[in-house]
Amino acid sequence: MSWYFFICFGGMFITHNGIIKAADEPILTAQNRSFKYGDGLFETLKVHQGSVMLASLHFERLFSGLLLLGIAATDDVTASLLEEQIKELCTLNRCAALARVRLTVYREEDDKAGYVIEAVPLHPEENKWNEEGWTADIYPYARKSCDVFARLKSTNHLPYVAAQLYAQEKGIDECLLLNNHNRICDGSRTNIFLVNKEKFYTPALYEGCVDGVMRRYLMDALKQRGFVVVQTEVNEALLQQSEECFLTNAIRGIRWIRSFREKQYSCTNTKTIYKEIIAPLYLKTED
């Protein structure tokens, strides 16, 4: 039985506070703080051949965020237990070969952590190089604040959701968000990198971007290979003068930008990064 048949005709499961339940079973009350206030965090993880990719970076970010929010992770909410439950759920949902997993952690009434794990099959195309390149623009209707919460993957995700809808309406692939200084901080579902004169530029965390897992992984990998990576303030002028522009996240890895408005980019360095750094994470062999 194919996973396509399995998905279409039901039978999917989730994990709620360590307990396997049917995906369509109600699990939250109207008093849930994540539902009412966005009082929680989430991680979007990629599972490949039964392994949770970049798991240590995901859980480091998650537990750091819970500490900041004052949400207590009890003994049954640990990185090792969550990782094991993610793997079990992927197996149960028949998507351990390649899956998108969402782990949502929210504040219970006693300030302890409650959580939900969802796992669905991921199309193999998500592993591949985006040959045609993406198009991008700036989302004009929101500004992110540059506070300590800006770097979190918060369930209060409204500016990003609105930016994704705006991109769909405009027929473009991604929208970039500005901070309250009118500088670029990140994309609606990505972090942004620019390549200019053999240097890599990305918005610093103090600029309000999400502390992306693939962003961190790639910066370390580039530095280990001797490249200069500059975390700085990124304005539209730098975007216009750069030779290459690409986006990163944990699911798609890397996506090169073909155009930003009238600006056209090349992808020579970006494709090399994909082949040498990103693809080996997910692919046993390369085309």
Model-derived regions: residue spans:
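Ordered, amphipathic secondary-structure segments that act as subunit-interaction surfaces
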Residues: 95-105, 112
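Helix-start/capping segments and mature chain N-termini
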Residues: 5-88, 106-108, 112-287
